[in-house]
Design a protein with these regions (language model features):
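Conserved GNAT acetyl-CoA-binding A-motif
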Residues: 77-88, 211-223
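Active-site rim helix/loop that mediates acceptor-substrate recognition in acyltransferases
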Residues: 18-38, 140-163
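Glycine-rich acetyl-CoA-binding "A-motif" of GNAT/NAT acetyltransferases
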Residues: 44-47, 167-170, 228
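Short amphipathic alpha-helix that is part of the acyltransferase structural core
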Residues: 1-25, 113-147
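Conserved acetyl-CoA-binding loop-helix of GNAT-fold acetyltransferases
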Residues: 64-76, 190, 196-212, 230-235
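A conserved beta-strand-loop-helix scaffold within acyl/acetyltransferase catalytic domains
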Residues: 50-53, 149-158, 163-183, 187-191
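Acyl-donor-binding surface of acyltransferase catalytic domains
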Residues: 47, 51-123, 247-248
Length: 251
Protein backbone atom coordinates (compact mmCIF):
# COMPACT_ATOMS: atom_id res chain seq x y z
CA UNK A 1 0.00 0.00 0.00
CA UNK A 2 1.28 3.48 -0.86
CA UNK A 3 1.98 5.36 2.36
CA UNK A 4 0.46 8.82 2.06
CA UNK A 5 1.84 11.36 4.51
CA UNK A 6 0.49 14.79 5.34
CA UNK A 7 3.03 17.49 4.49
CA UNK A 8 3.22 21.20 5.16
CA UNK A 9 4.00 22.38 1.65
CA UNK A 10 2.75 21.63 -1.83
CA UNK A 11 5.35 19.62 -3.84
CA UNK A 12 6.06 22.26 -6.47
CA UNK A 13 7.87 20.00 -8.94
CA UNK A 14 5.12 17.36 -8.89
CA UNK A 15 2.44 20.02 -9.17
CA UNK A 16 4.16 21.50 -12.22
CA UNK A 17 4.19 18.05 -13.79
CA UNK A 18 0.49 17.62 -13.02
CA UNK A 19 -0.50 20.95 -14.58
CA UNK A 20 1.68 20.19 -17.62
CA UNK A 21 -0.06 16.83 -18.03
CA UNK A 22 -3.49 18.45 -18.42
CA UNK A 23 -4.63 19.22 -21.98
CA UNK A 24 -6.41 22.38 -20.77
CA UNK A 25 -5.67 25.04 -18.13
CA UNK A 26 -6.62 24.72 -14.49
CA UNK A 27 -9.93 26.12 -13.17
CA UNK A 28 -9.74 29.17 -10.89
CA UNK A 29 -12.43 27.82 -8.54
CA UNK A 30 -10.33 24.71 -7.93
CA UNK A 31 -7.11 26.71 -7.77
CA UNK A 32 -8.52 28.71 -4.86
CA UNK A 33 -9.32 25.48 -3.01
CA UNK A 34 -5.84 24.13 -3.74
CA UNK A 35 -4.22 27.31 -2.43
CA UNK A 36 -5.71 26.82 1.04
CA UNK A 37 -5.84 23.03 0.96
CA UNK A 38 -4.47 20.20 3.07
CA UNK A 39 -1.61 18.42 1.27
CA UNK A 40 -0.72 14.72 1.34
CA UNK A 41 2.19 13.14 -0.55
CA UNK A 42 3.36 9.61 -1.25
CA UNK A 43 7.01 8.65 -1.86
CA UNK A 44 6.54 6.76 -5.13
CA UNK A 45 5.54 10.00 -6.81
CA UNK A 46 2.26 11.75 -6.29
CA UNK A 47 0.16 13.94 -4.05
CA UNK A 48 -3.39 14.79 -3.03
CA UNK A 49 -4.98 18.04 -1.87
CA UNK A 50 -8.10 18.24 0.27
CA UNK A 51 -10.53 20.99 1.15
CA UNK A 52 -12.44 19.66 4.14
CA UNK A 53 -13.97 16.32 3.20
CA UNK A 54 -13.44 16.92 -0.53
CA UNK A 55 -10.49 15.80 -2.65
CA UNK A 56 -9.75 18.75 -4.97
CA UNK A 57 -6.58 17.55 -6.69
CA UNK A 58 -4.86 14.20 -7.19
CA UNK A 59 -1.78 13.24 -9.16
CA UNK A 60 0.18 10.01 -9.55
CA UNK A 61 3.30 9.71 -11.69
CA UNK A 62 2.38 6.06 -12.24
CA UNK A 63 -0.89 6.86 -14.01
CA UNK A 64 -1.61 3.23 -14.92
CA UNK A 65 -2.00 2.44 -11.22
CA UNK A 66 -3.74 5.68 -10.30
CA UNK A 67 -6.88 3.80 -9.22
CA UNK A 68 -4.86 1.73 -6.75
CA UNK A 69 -3.23 4.84 -5.30
CA UNK A 70 -6.65 6.50 -5.08
CA UNK A 71 -8.09 3.47 -3.30
CA UNK A 72 -5.21 3.50 -0.83
CA UNK A 73 -5.63 7.23 -0.29
CA UNK A 74 -9.27 7.02 0.80
CA UNK A 75 -8.38 4.32 3.33
CA UNK A 76 -5.65 6.48 4.86
CA UNK A 77 -7.37 9.87 4.59
CA UNK A 78 -11.15 9.39 4.18
CA UNK A 79 -13.12 11.83 2.01
CA UNK A 80 -16.72 12.02 0.79
CA UNK A 81 -16.38 13.39 -2.72
CA UNK A 82 -13.97 14.58 -5.41
CA UNK A 83 -14.00 17.74 -7.54
CA UNK A 84 -12.47 17.19 -10.95
CA UNK A 85 -12.17 18.63 -14.45
CA UNK A 86 -13.57 16.39 -17.17
CA UNK A 87 -10.26 16.72 -19.04
CA UNK A 88 -8.35 15.24 -16.08
CA UNK A 89 -8.67 11.80 -17.61
CA UNK A 90 -6.33 10.04 -15.17
CA UNK A 91 -8.51 10.93 -12.19
CA UNK A 92 -11.77 10.35 -14.08
CA UNK A 93 -10.63 6.91 -15.27
CA UNK A 94 -9.34 5.96 -11.82
CA UNK A 95 -12.67 6.88 -10.20
CA UNK A 96 -14.61 4.92 -12.81
CA UNK A 97 -12.45 1.84 -12.24
CA UNK A 98 -13.36 2.07 -8.56
CA UNK A 99 -17.06 2.28 -9.39
CA UNK A 100 -17.52 5.81 -8.08
CA UNK A 101 -20.40 7.95 -9.38
CA UNK A 102 -19.76 11.00 -11.60
CA UNK A 103 -22.08 14.03 -11.83
CA UNK A 104 -21.49 17.07 -14.04
CA UNK A 105 -21.93 20.29 -12.05
CA UNK A 106 -20.36 23.08 -14.11
CA UNK A 107 -19.44 24.30 -17.58
CA UNK A 108 -15.75 24.98 -18.33
CA UNK A 109 -15.06 27.27 -21.28
CA UNK A 110 -11.61 26.83 -22.83
CA UNK A 111 -12.39 27.86 -26.42
CA UNK A 112 -13.64 31.13 -27.89
CA UNK A 113 -14.87 31.93 -31.37
CA UNK A 114 -14.55 35.44 -32.83
CA UNK A 115 -17.68 37.53 -32.28
CA UNK A 116 -18.63 41.18 -32.68
CA UNK A 117 -21.22 42.46 -30.22
CA UNK A 118 -23.17 45.64 -30.80
CA UNK A 119 -22.98 48.11 -27.94
CA UNK A 120 -23.92 51.73 -27.41
CA UNK A 121 -21.37 54.52 -27.13
CA UNK A 122 -22.46 54.99 -23.52
CA UNK A 123 -21.09 51.59 -22.41
CA UNK A 124 -17.46 51.24 -21.37
CA UNK A 125 -15.20 49.23 -19.08
CA UNK A 126 -12.44 50.67 -16.91
CA UNK A 127 -10.15 49.53 -14.13
CA UNK A 128 -11.73 49.86 -10.72
CA UNK A 129 -10.85 52.72 -8.40
CA UNK A 130 -10.90 52.47 -4.62
CA UNK A 131 -14.11 54.51 -4.59
CA UNK A 132 -15.83 51.79 -6.66
CA UNK A 133 -15.30 48.97 -4.17
CA UNK A 134 -18.41 49.40 -1.96
CA UNK A 135 -20.73 49.43 -4.98
CA UNK A 136 -18.86 46.56 -6.64
CA UNK A 137 -19.47 44.48 -3.51
CA UNK A 138 -23.12 45.51 -3.08
CA UNK A 139 -23.90 44.82 -6.74
CA UNK A 140 -22.05 41.50 -6.79
CA UNK A 141 -22.81 39.83 -3.47
CA UNK A 142 -24.01 36.71 -5.31
CA UNK A 143 -20.68 36.53 -7.19
CA UNK A 144 -17.95 37.61 -4.76
CA UNK A 145 -17.30 35.66 -1.56
CA UNK A 146 -16.64 38.71 0.62
CA UNK A 147 -15.62 42.37 0.74
CA UNK A 148 -12.08 41.17 1.38
CA UNK A 149 -12.08 39.21 -1.87
CA UNK A 150 -13.20 42.30 -3.81
CA UNK A 151 -10.43 44.33 -2.16
CA UNK A 152 -7.83 41.64 -2.89
CA UNK A 153 -8.77 41.47 -6.57
CA UNK A 154 -8.66 45.28 -6.71
CA UNK A 155 -5.19 45.42 -5.15
CA UNK A 156 -3.89 42.98 -7.76
CA UNK A 157 -5.23 45.25 -10.53
CA UNK A 158 -7.68 42.61 -11.76
CA UNK A 159 -11.02 44.30 -10.96
CA UNK A 160 -12.90 46.13 -13.72
CA UNK A 161 -16.06 48.23 -13.58
CA UNK A 162 -18.67 48.49 -16.35
CA UNK A 163 -20.54 51.76 -16.82
CA UNK A 164 -23.51 52.61 -18.99
CA UNK A 165 -24.81 56.16 -19.26
CA UNK A 166 -22.51 57.09 -16.40
CA UNK A 167 -23.77 54.54 -13.87
CA UNK A 168 -22.20 51.29 -12.72
CA UNK A 169 -23.98 48.32 -14.30
CA UNK A 170 -21.60 45.55 -13.34
CA UNK A 171 -18.03 44.43 -12.75
CA UNK A 172 -15.56 41.95 -14.15
CA UNK A 173 -12.42 40.18 -13.00
CA UNK A 174 -9.24 38.84 -14.57
CA UNK A 175 -7.34 36.20 -12.59
CA UNK A 176 -4.04 34.85 -14.00
CA UNK A 177 -4.07 31.05 -13.66
CA UNK A 178 -0.90 29.31 -14.72
CA UNK A 179 1.72 31.54 -13.11
CA UNK A 180 2.94 32.99 -16.40
CA UNK A 181 0.01 35.33 -16.89
CA UNK A 182 -0.73 33.92 -20.34
CA UNK A 183 -3.89 32.10 -19.23
CA UNK A 184 -6.42 34.30 -17.44
CA UNK A 185 -9.72 33.26 -15.85
CA UNK A 186 -12.36 35.94 -16.35
CA UNK A 187 -15.75 36.46 -14.76
CA UNK A 188 -18.49 39.04 -14.55
CA UNK A 189 -21.50 40.06 -12.52
CA UNK A 190 -24.25 42.51 -13.46
CA UNK A 191 -26.08 44.80 -11.05
CA UNK A 192 -29.36 43.06 -10.16
CA UNK A 193 -31.62 45.77 -11.58
CA UNK A 194 -29.60 45.84 -14.83
CA UNK A 195 -29.73 42.14 -15.65
CA UNK A 196 -31.21 40.68 -18.84
CA UNK A 197 -30.05 43.71 -20.82
CA UNK A 198 -26.96 42.11 -22.38
CA UNK A 199 -24.41 43.80 -20.13
CA UNK A 200 -22.92 40.50 -18.90
CA UNK A 201 -21.96 39.50 -22.45
CA UNK A 202 -20.51 42.95 -23.11
CA UNK A 203 -18.41 42.84 -19.94
CA UNK A 204 -16.95 39.40 -20.59
CA UNK A 205 -16.46 40.15 -24.29
CA UNK A 206 -14.51 43.34 -23.56
CA UNK A 207 -12.36 41.53 -21.00
CA UNK A 208 -11.65 38.69 -23.42
CA UNK A 209 -10.89 41.06 -26.30
CA UNK A 210 -8.43 43.00 -24.15
CA UNK A 211 -6.60 39.84 -23.11
CA UNK A 212 -6.47 38.45 -26.63
CA UNK A 213 -5.05 41.76 -27.89
CA UNK A 214 -2.19 41.19 -25.41
CA UNK A 215 -1.59 37.65 -26.65
CA UNK A 216 -3.23 36.06 -23.62
CA UNK A 217 -5.84 33.32 -23.41
CA UNK A 218 -9.12 34.03 -21.58
CA UNK A 219 -10.93 31.11 -19.97
CA UNK A 220 -14.02 30.96 -17.75
CA UNK A 221 -16.60 28.72 -16.15
CA UNK A 222 -20.01 28.71 -14.50
CA UNK A 223 -22.28 26.39 -12.56
CA UNK A 224 -24.44 24.06 -14.63
CA UNK A 225 -27.52 25.57 -12.98
CA UNK A 226 -26.54 29.12 -13.95
CA UNK A 227 -28.02 29.12 -17.44
CA UNK A 228 -28.03 32.92 -17.61
CA UNK A 229 -24.24 33.05 -17.23
CA UNK A 230 -23.82 30.21 -19.70
CA UNK A 231 -25.90 32.10 -22.28
CA UNK A 232 -23.95 35.31 -21.67
CA UNK A 233 -20.60 33.55 -22.11
CA UNK A 234 -21.75 31.81 -25.27
CA UNK A 235 -22.99 35.11 -26.70
CA UNK A 236 -19.49 36.47 -26.09
CA UNK A 237 -18.07 33.64 -28.20
CA UNK A 238 -17.10 31.12 -25.53
CA UNK A 239 -17.63 27.42 -26.19
CA UNK A 240 -17.88 24.78 -23.45
CA UNK A 241 -16.40 21.42 -24.40
CA UNK A 242 -15.55 20.42 -20.82
CA UNK A 243 -17.26 20.12 -17.45
CA UNK A 244 -16.61 20.44 -13.76
CA UNK A 245 -17.38 17.02 -12.30
CA UNK A 246 -18.27 15.90 -8.79
CA UNK A 247 -17.36 12.31 -7.98
CA UNK A 248 -19.22 10.58 -5.17
CA UNK A 249 -18.03 7.57 -3.23
CA UNK A 250 -20.74 4.95 -2.56
CA UNK A 251 -21.41 4.11 1.10
Amino acid sequence: MSAFLRVADLPISLRSQYLASLPEPQEWFLEELVRTGEVWEFPCGGYAIFHGDTLVEFYALDSTNAHRHLSNLIQQRPFRKVLCKSFDRVLIDAAQKLGWALVETGFLFRKRNPVILTKSDTFHLERARAIDLPDAWMNGRDFYDSKDEVAQIFRSGDLWIAFNEGQMVGSGIMIPIDGSGDVVDIGMVTRPDQRNRGFASLIVSDLANLLESEGKRPICGCAETNLASKAALEKAGFVSEHRLVEIYIPD
